[in-house]
Amino acid sequence: MFKIIKCNQINNKLINKKIEINGWVKKIRNHGKVTFINIRDRYDEAQILVSDEKLLKITSQIKMEYCIKIQGKLNLRPLELVNREMKTGELEIIAENIDIISKCNELPFMIENNNNASDNSKLEYRYLDLRREEQKQKIILRSKVIHIIRNHLTKQDFLELETPTFVKSTPEGARDFLVPSRIHKGHFYALPQSPQIYKQLAMIAGLDKYFQIARCYRDEDSRGDRQPEFTQLDLEMSFIKKENIFKLIENLIFTIFKNSLNITLPKKFKKITYKDAMNIYGSDKPDTRYELLIQDMSKALKQSPFDVFKDTLQNKGTIKALIIKNQAHNFSRSKINSLEEHAKLYKARTLYFTKIENNEFTGGIAKFINPIKKTLIETYSLKNNDIIFFIADLWETACKAIGQIRIKIATELNLINKNIFEFLWIYDFPLFEYDEDTQSYKAAHHMFSMPQAKYINTLESNPSKVLGEVYDIVLNGTELGSGSIRVHTKELQQRIFNIVGFNDKIAEERFDFFLKALEYGAPIHGGIAIGIDRLLMLMTNSNSIKDVILFPKNSFAASPLDKSPSKISDEQLKELNLTIENK
């Protein structure tokens, strides 16, 4: 009898024992009277030695990635043939039986080295790409992380609840994916962009601790880090404050990293307000792995004779600056021009600069800076070979543009430590933002977030000044998740709907069922949703969330694997009472 085992179960205790393993041919080497086969399964790989003449005839038919069954006796390898790069490198199986379970066509790319394969090819043959150790381990880690999440939250009395997948269309910013109803002709379901309303209904039901590994769907324009369907950890709690969410998530993420990567994170994460994040880092999702802090030079440059600075300050703008210490020699004119063009992509009028050489400001706008050089040098401890970049504009534009320059410079100067994980909470977000195109307010996060108490009575008088009980969690410059304390009264929810342009009639049409529920004793509640795909992308240092999704779509929201989306038959269209108009 042969004992069926996996490759990782091969060990010295099985020497001289008869064993059977099944897997895929990773490598095959024919040495005439002896053939060596490396077989791979999910767990590891093993070497097979074939010397029997009858079996050699079979191995002559075997090619890479054939699925095979091997039966044989486990032996120690000769010392000189030990492979230290393999976990099972001291052992090999002397083949007694070989069965070809199934053959493999000519490969579209090499499994072990598919760097030359196109992204579309790897997606079309994703089942082959997943045989690569690196890709396989990412998917295994995904399973492990989700298991840790479930265990951790269940131990804390959370209920894993499933919210509907077919819901009423209540657009949350992106377009809904719509599903026509055959029974209710002319009516449509939507696939949920998030379980937001339904988890709030669960709180109203008294199910005070909810979580879900939720599938979400958004019909967004193509972008590299987006997928039309994605997975998030969605959770909600009743009778809490935001600090309860912070503590819960910090403990959860600490457990995830410790139990999956054996990395010990700080027990508490840094916290910073939205305004400070914008002022110091130029981003509401800052990367804090490197310093390179933004300076507000509005006061210091007030006496500069430069008209652009004067006009900006007179028009209630600001002057933001980046000081790059001892690096002026690394910034050629062409590199500075490139940075200027980069700043303009983020609506800045331009990017100004000056360098310090021989205790004088030189280049760029030096002639406008030298009259106040003593003040600047003393205030900012400037030295020779420093270079300063300036953006003068309205506050938000100046912050965002100089923030993007910060990222670009840090990348080009290799200032980013890619071996650390810097988590950060951002809070005190504006509840609303003004859309210049539509001349109206919209929710900065979503319409169900609670205003801070001090703004509730004067909500409508100046919506752009209102701060919300809203928070984001950021990892290495990527927004991982967003949450808030929720509105729990119908009256306040209707006021917020009105501010974002939903009058009572529209609000009733779209959210009547939710507004009704708010009249039946809703508790104080709040929660968060964390992108599992993004978290895993960062944990594995991947370039895209596609790497950590089992069968992802490409950047055009299409699947090269199954060729979806696809046309449907005229019969199906007729059943759904749909017609296609060609325009």
Swiss-Prot record:
Write out the residues that bind L-aspartate.
E172, R218, H445, R486
Q: What is its main location?
A: cytoplasm
Q: Where is this site: Important for tRNA non-discrimination?
A: H31
> Could you tell me what reaction this enzyme catalyses?
tRNA(Asx) + L-aspartate + ATP = L-aspartyl-tRNA(Asx) + AMP + diphosphate
Q: Which GO terms describe its molecular function?
A: aspartate-tRNA ligase activity; aspartate-tRNA(Asn) ligase activity; ATP binding; nucleic acid binding
Q: Where does it localize?
A: Cytoplasm
Identification of the protein by name = Aspartate--tRNA(Asp/Asn) ligase
Keyword 4Fe-4S in the entry? The reply is no
Q: Name one GO biological process term.
A: aspartyl-tRNA aminoacylation
Q: What quaternary structure, including any partners, is listed in this protein's UniProt entry? A: Homodimer.
UniProt keyword list? Aminoacyl-tRNA synthetase, ATP-binding, Cytoplasm, Ligase, Nucleotide-binding, Protein biosynthesis
- NCBIfam families (UniProt xref): aspS_bact (TIGR00459), PRK00476.1 (NF001750)
Q: Where is this region: Aspartate?
A: 196-199
HAMAP family xref list: Asp_tRNA_synth_type1
**PANTHER family (UniProt xref):** ASPARTATE--TRNA LIGASE, MITOCHONDRIAL, ASPARTYL/LYSYL-TRNA SYNTHETASE
Q: Which gene encodes it?
A: aspS
Q: Tell me its EC number(s), please.
A: 6.1.1.23
Classification via CDD domains: AspRS_core, EcAspRS_like_N
